[in-house]
From Swiss-Prot:
Organism: Escherichia coli (strain K12)
Protein name from the UniProt record: HTH-type transcriptional regulator GgaR
Effects seen without this gene: In rich medium, deletion of the gene results in an inability to repress the yegTUV operon and promote glycogen accumulation, but no effect on growth is observed. In minimal glucose medium, the deletion mutant promotes glycogen accumulation, at the expense of poor cell proliferation. The mutant shows increased biofilm formation.
Annotation: DNA-binding region: 50-69
Record keywords, A-Z: DNA-binding, Repressor, Transcription, Transcription regulation
UniProt function note: Transcriptional regulator that regulates glycogen accumulation in response to the amount of glucose available to the cell. Acts as a repressor of the yegTUV operon, which may be involved in glycogen accumulation. Binds at two adjacent sites within the yegTUV upstream region.
Taxonomy of the source species: Bacteria, Pseudomonadati, Pseudomonadota, Gammaproteobacteria, Enterobacterales
Length: 248
């Protein structure tokens, strides 16, 4: 822990001294987030107190407190009186990468798992048909599952896939994209839309989440190398555990 704190303080001081117009509390918060991404800080680590951070970095306690508030609002940390500020189990998910959930989890050094709720053929709803470029009422597979990261439930996902793309639905394990690749179908890129809403009763029946914490809703179309839609998914994700990244 001492080594992690030493590295964090060094990174904070370097960022604070950088000559740009970014507000100090944002520099502070960004540095903590980068330390989590790089593995310097891990889930469950306790940060130094506000007074120590202020003394070691030369910034005011007000600035430190503002940075901690920003981090708490983003779900990066949890603050509790008498216990301190703890790093949450954040999963950073790229909206640009066409790798799929399981592969992204593994690449970030975490353990993925899936609990299947449903795998069945249904008639394609109008909204889904538009996204998949198929006829409304045509056969599609509806795949519903609960996603886990390091044995913690983080999201509920529903996917619709044109029926002709799945020859053996029981062969799909924790990763739909692994199944696609086994059938020589290669997801190339994705189109995503992100919104927020409060958790409903169904979400809370599967995933424990404070009713005051919003759920992130990600609607995504996956396209193959010929730019043909191969999957349309709607994911409801815990906003306190997910960080979505979209970079050019």
């Amino acid at each position: 822990m001492e080594q992690a704190h030493t590295q964090l303080i060094a990174q904070l001081n370097e960022r604070i001294l950088a000559a740009d117009n970014t507000p100090l509390y944002i520099k502070f918060a960004e540095t903590v987030k980068n330390a989590v991404r790089s593995g310097v800080l891990e889930h469950g680590n306790i940060l130094p107190g506000e007074r120590d951070l202020s003394q070691l970095t030369g910034v005011s306690r007000i600035t430190v407190r503002k940075a901690m508030q920003a981090l708490e609002e983003e779900g990066v940390v949890t603050r509790s009186r008498g216990y301190g500020t703890q790093i949450n189990n954040i999963f950073e998910y790229s909206l640009k990468e066409a790798r799929g959930f399981s592969q992204q989890v593994v690449l970030r050094g975490k353990k993925p798992d899936t609990l299947w709720v449903n795998k069945r053929v249904v008639k394609c709803p109008e909204e889904v048909a538009q996204q998949l470029a198929v006829e409304a009422g045509s056969d599609v597979f509806l795949l519903k599952r609960i996603r886990y990261v390091d044995e913690e439930a983080v999201s509920i996902e529903e996917s619709w896939v044109p029926a002709h793309l799945i020859h053996d639905v029981d062969a799909i394990g924790i990763s739909l994209y692994d199944y696609f690749r086994s059938q020589h179908i290669y997801p190339q890129r994705t189109r995503s839309r992100v919104s927020a809403r409060m958790p409903d009763a169904e979400f809370q029946s599967h995933i424990q989440l404070d009713s005051k914490i919003p759920v992130l809703v990600i609607k995504q179309v996956a396209l193959d190398q010929q730019q043909r839609p191969i999957e349309y998914s709607i994911s409801h994700c815990r906003s306190d555990l997910y960080v979505f990244v979209c970079e050019e």
